[in-house]
Amino acid sequence: MNKEQELIDRLIDLAFAEDIGDGDHTTLSCIPETAMGKSKLLIKEAGILAGIEVAKEVFRRFDPTMKVTVYINDGAEVKPGAVAMIVEGKVQSLLQTERLMLNIMQRMSGIATMTHKYQERLKGTHTRVLDTRKTTPGMRILEKMAVKIGGGVNHRIGLFDMILLKDNHVDFAGGIDKAITRAKEYCKAKGKDLKIEIEVRNFDELQQVLDLGGVDRIMFDNFTPEMTRKAVEMVGGRYETESSGGITFDTLRDYAECGVDFISVGALTHSVKGLDMSFKAC
C-alpha cells in the first residue's frame, strides 16, 4: 500500500469512528438488516466533479458488498440534474455512508471547481496556480488531489518533501546567506535530494539570493504587480518564480502577466464552498 492510500484509509476510518460511534441507532432502529436498495448521487450545482474514486473507497471500506456504478468521472464538468453514480446494496450501509461520502465529494468538488476557475483566468499565460499547506487538518491529501483534478499544481505536500525558507526561517537563521547555506549543507549531510525555495520580501533580499544562488525557486511575498514585473526581470529566467500573498481572483491575471511561473493561492483550500449535491433513494 502506498503512502497516499494509507492516509486516505486512515481518514475514512477516523471519519466513520467519529460519525457512527457505537452505532447509527436511527438506521438500526427502523431499517431491517436485510433491506436492499439503491441511491443516486444527484448534482445540484454546476462545477467540476472530484472525489468519485475516494467515494468508491468509502463504500468499499464500509461494506465491500456495495455495488457502485459510475456515470461521471473525476474532472468532468457537471450541471444540475446530472447523476454521477448509483450505489446499490444494504439500505443500512447506504444510510451510514451517505454523509461521509457527501462531505468528501462536496468539498473536493468545490476545491476542483474553484481551482478550475482560477486556472481558466490564467489562460494565455504560462503561469500555473499552486495550492498551499492551508488545508483542513487530516484532509490534506484529499484537498490536494482535488486541486490537481481542477487543473492546478500541488506545491509541497508537507514539511518533508521540499525546503521552503520563509521569512521566519531567514530571520531565525540570521539572514538569507546563512539560511540557504545551511539548507544546502543539511541536504548534503542527510543525502536528501530536495528542491529549495526561498521567500523574499523586497528587492534587497532578492538581490542577495541572486548573488548567492543555490535555490530552485524564488517566492515574491506580498509584492505588487509592478514590483513583481521588476523582480521577474531581475531573475531573468535563472530560477523558477512564484507570487504569493494577498492575491485574489481579480488580481490573479495582473500577476500572471508579469511573467511569474506560479501563483500560490491559499483560498483554494481554506475558503472554499462545497459543490451542492445529494444522495437520494432511487
Language-model features, listed with the residues they occupy:
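Acidic/glycine-rich phosphate/pyrophosphate-binding loops and surrounding catalytic core
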Residues: 1-212, 217, 226-234, 239-240, ...
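Active-site loop ensemble at the mouth of alpha/beta enzyme cores that anchors a bound cofactor
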Residues: 278-282
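Glycine-rich beta-strand-to-loop/alpha-helix junction loops that act as flexible
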Residues: 220-221, 241-247, 265-267
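Active-site glycine- and acidic-residue-rich loops that bind
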Residues: 138-140, 245-248
